[in-house]
Amino acid sequence: MDTRRTRSTRWAGAAVAAGALGVALVIPAGQVGAATGDTYQVRNLVSDVPGVAQVTDPHLVNAWGVSFSGASPLWVSDNEKDVATLYAGGVHGGTQTINPLVVNIPGGAPTGQVSNPTTSFVVHGSDGSSAPARFLFVGESGHLSGWAPTVPPPPPSTQAQDAVVTPGAVDKGLALGMTDNGPMLYVADFSAGTVDVYNGLFQRVITAGNFQDRKLPDGFAPFNVAVLGGKVYVTYAKQDADRVDEVAGAGMGRLDVFSLDGRLLDRAAGHGQLNAPWGLAIAPAGFGAFSGDLLVGNFGDGRIHAFDPSTLVPTGVVSGEDGRPVTIDGLWALQPGNGTEGGTDEVLFTAGPQDESHGLLGSLSLSD
């Protein structure tokens, strides 16, 4: 069954990403934490729609998860095209380029992805070739796959390889953590409402805490997962009746933090501003008052909220140069730049604007 997203979940008031900035509903005073006074500039770098961004790439449709490998180009999961594409440039608005490599993702509909710096997570080609995956992917079809440049030869390969297929799973997020028992993959299965853990042999592992939150409202499920600073951050959204897509709305989101073995450490007390949250990143140095804060991007209304990463206390909302909250239609990933794609003081974002029928890669930086 194709579990690819089929409907819009955004409020009608969300701005189209082609405009980059927009105004959504006003959040009551005190709900988002202290105002910072800093404002941020949004740049559109790549889109599938001509004229929207610096460059046009027809593969970039419903741009979702992202990852880097050291100083590599940025890898982006193109959910509606069943591929991953690579980008470099765009540093502080500089020249943006498209890498010619396009990687096919088995099962299609890719969502989360991670780079793998370890020698674990070996993938195998039908020709007998094998190597550790350099990048790993999950998708709404329940496929966990990996790409290695030599599998199959000749390099660079244009095909990721299946590692685990879970019938009925609708995987929305993927993270990699380094534990005392070796590297582990964390997969957010939105349909089952679980965070599934796999070791370096792609074997399922039951953790001590098993990522349980007994105070989570009924019908909320893991929407994304990220390992940041040695902790596992999990965002939750409300499931629709089919347990495939999220239900958007003010307060329709939760945020928890766990240990690497799945023990609940804390919950975000202020979740009224969360609206189907998916994007997770620690803001880099040079990102103004939010430097070092946990950034949480709402898919539901396109806003980006900041939290103290230690206490999960809200610290504010990212605002544009007009002083109003930045609103990015169909916002998915948040990722600090690495100097190859985006500056090291910038935050990259992906989005699936206009009901996920288009794609956008852009950047956020402190206003000049």
For each predicted feature, which ranges?
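Secretory targeting and sorting signals
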Residues: D2-G33
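Sequence/structural signature of beta-propeller domains
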Residues: G30-D368
